[in-house]
Amino acid sequence: DWTTPSCLPPLLPPGAVEAVQEAAPEAAEEPEEEEDDMGFSLFD
């Protein structure tokens, strides 16, 4: 859960959490995104 990371202390501001989610929101929620990345790689 991004809301309660066990490896990181709960001292991070909400901005940091949003930054992580914006960096890879679908990748974290939907592993299917990885398949799409592989598809894009093949197209490249």
UniProtKB/Swiss-Prot annotation:
Q: Where is the composition biased (Low complexity)?
A: 14-26
Q: Where is the composition biased (Acidic residues)?
A: 27-38
Q: Name one Pfam family in it.
A: Ribosomal_60s
Listed name of the protein: High molecular weight antigen
Report the domain of life of the source organism.
Answer: Eukaryota
Give the start-end ranges of region Disordered: 1-44
